[in-house]
Structure formats: C-alpha cells, structure tokens
Amino acid sequence: MGYTISDNRLQADDYIRLFASAGWGEPPRDMTEKALENSYATFSVEADGRVVAMARLLGDGAMAFFLKDFVVEPQMQGRGIGKALLAHIEEYIRLQLVNGWAGYLQLVSAKGKEGFYQKMGFAAHPHEHSGPGMSKWIRKE
C-alpha cells in the first residue's frame, strides 16, 4: 500500500473525522479551523485517495515543539504509517534547527500507546532529567 505524507494541507473535515476515530469526540468546526490555522505545522497521510493519519505540531519553531493530535485510523494501524509520519515530523523539525543545536519535542501519549513512542526514542516521564509531565483541562460550560 502506498501513501503520501503532506505538510500543511490538513483540512478541517479530515481532522474532525480522524479525531473522532481516536474516540475523542467531534470538535466544533470553528474551533478546529482555528486550531489548524494556529498550528506551527500540520501533517496528513493520504492512502487510496483519502486521509488516513494526521498530526499537528505546536511550538516556537526554534527550540520547543509539541506533538498534538497524532492519529492513525484504527484500521490502518500496524502498517508503518505512524512510524513514517513521526520520522517525517522529526525531519521537519530538524530542518528548523541551527546546526549543532537540538530542539525539544514533547507529547502526551494516549493511554496504551506509550510503547509506540518509546520505540521511536521518546522517554517516559519522570526520568533522570525531568519530573512528570503535567496537564490541566480548562473547560468552558
């Protein structure tokens, strides 16, 4: 199966569909469009004429990056698409860096997916260089 990885072409309809396929619900379109517009970069993977995977990259474009909404459709998992997408994103970041310098890529793994990221070189927190990652949901009722 062939697939194509694209930078900054992710559309709201595909984002909403893939987001829901991960079991996270369907975000409102206006919120989705704003999130995509304000992302540092977006990535999509197309196979057989449809988008089957996506990710957003947030950050300052120089030193700090955060991987968000990394999704491969459940029926497309296990085919190397996620590995290829993550490798592509890492190379995208590498191209933003100054020679001899490293950027810091962080993420929050979906429960049960930690092993995938660890195989790709990510360290679980806490570890010898940092404490546990922390997060907080801010909700508008």
Task: Indicate where each model-derived feature is located.
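A short helix-loop-beta-strand connector motif used in the catalytic cores of GNAT acetyltransferases and
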Residues: K34-S44, W101-G103
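Conserved acetyl-CoA pyrophosphate-binding loop and the N-cap/start of the following alpha-helix
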Residues: M76, G80-H88
